[in-house]
Regions:
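Helix-coil boundary/capping segments in enzymes
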Residues: 1-344
Length: 344
């Protein structure tokens, strides 16, 4: 079995139902310099464009990219047995009403796939009884086995105290939560002007910031039963792991500049944090092999970000198989880690 843990889903009905489209676009948080608009491509297809900041496109949802039969055909071509449906960025601002609508849509999509596609529930990060009821519905009625969130909401990362009561409930349930990157980090003023800097590096800065805050704020001391799976390999976290866990100096120093008592942080990295690659080919062979060596194959999950680029799905598994890592490592990345964390 091969599992693609990152197949994007957007409700195609939005392209054909004016009232639904209006409702979706009305919730885009313009107070946070975010804009959403419907456009027509030269070939006649519609697309929803999300800009952040205004005038700078960051996410595109294109009509026809989310057709079940096409997704299954592409999965067949690439040898993908099971895909996990993810919402690309827009759940940062969805109301509970729209979350319910998207949860119903994902559940129906998964049901019609004959078990090939699975969903993760989405809710606003609030501790109201209505939100808890929707989480329970996702798990007990819709058949979802985890939740999906974004790295920050508004100007606040997930370690912010305003989310604590929400995570208390998630901790009680012992859930795996997939953490998708936002289009740009909270502080993006020097990142937005250039397209590749914004769309690639900006997302990694967002994830890296989120993980550092989760680790050093004591988040997992408070919520030890939660497992987070961060996209984009946690913003290339493998490059920084050793830097944030410095060893004690070999000789006595008058000034101690770094925290070296990092046992709890290392423990949370082992138990609570996992990394989905989002796509294999863009990272490259050397980077993925380094990530496996540093983070451990048991902490890395394969995903393709389909349909951003079709080839990331159709050629992604073979790219992982060609890495200079053990067969057991490849099996963990392509299958076993997702199966375990998402209870497939």
């Amino acid at each position: 079995m091969v599992i693609d843990a990152n197949i994007y889903w957007f409700d195609e009905k939005i392209f054909h139902d004016d009232a639904y489209a209006e409702q979706f676009l009305a919730e885009v948080p313009r107070l946070y310099q975010t804009e959403g608009k419907m456009e027509i491509l030269p070939n006649g297809r519609k697309q929803v464009v999300i800009e952040k900041p205004f005038g700078y496109a960051n996410v595109n949802y294109v009509e026809g990219d989310y057709i079940l039969e096409n997704i299954l055909a592409d999965m067949d071509q690439s040898g993908i047995d099971v895909g996990i449906l993810k919402l690309p960025c827009y759940h940062e601002w969805l109301s509970l009403e729209l979350c319910k609508k998207f949860n119903d849509g994902m559940a129906d999509f998964a049901k019609r796939s004959g078990g090939r596609l699975r969903g993760l529930g989405v809710v606003p990060p609030r501790a109201s009884q209505a939100v808890k009821d929707e989480i329970d519905r996702c798990l007990n009625t819709l058949g979802f086995t985890g939740l999906q969130m974004v790295a920050h909401y508004g100007d606040h990362y997930l370690d912010d105290e305003q989310f604590a009561e929400f995570f208390e409930y998630i901790n009680e349930l012992g859930l795996t939560v997939y953490i998708h990157h936002n289009p740009v980090p909270v502080e993006f003023n020097q990142l937005y002007e250039y397209n590749n800097v914004r769309r690639s590096y900006g997302r990694n800065v967002d994830q890296g910031t989120a993980i550092m805050r989760e680790l050093f704020s004591g988040f997992f001391d408070k919520f030890p039963n939660i497992k987070f799976v961060h996209s984009m390999l946690g913003g290339g976290f493998f490059a920084f792991k050793n830097l944030i866990l410095p060893k004690k100096a070999t000789k006595a120093e008058d000034v101690q500049r770094f925290q070296t008592d990092n046992g709890d942080i290392a423990r949370h990295l082992e138990k609570n944090l996992f990394f989905e690659m989002s796509h294999a080919q863009p990272w490259g062979k050397d980077q993925l092999e380094a990530a496996v060596k540093i983070l451990g194959a048991d902490h890395i999950i394969y995903g393709s970000s389909y349909p951003v680029r079709k080839e990331w799905l159709t050629a992604g598994p073979d790219f992982v198989r060609a890495l200079d890592i053990s067969d057991s490592d490849k099996d963990m990345i392509l299958t076993e880690n997702a199966k375990r964390l998402y209870r497939l």
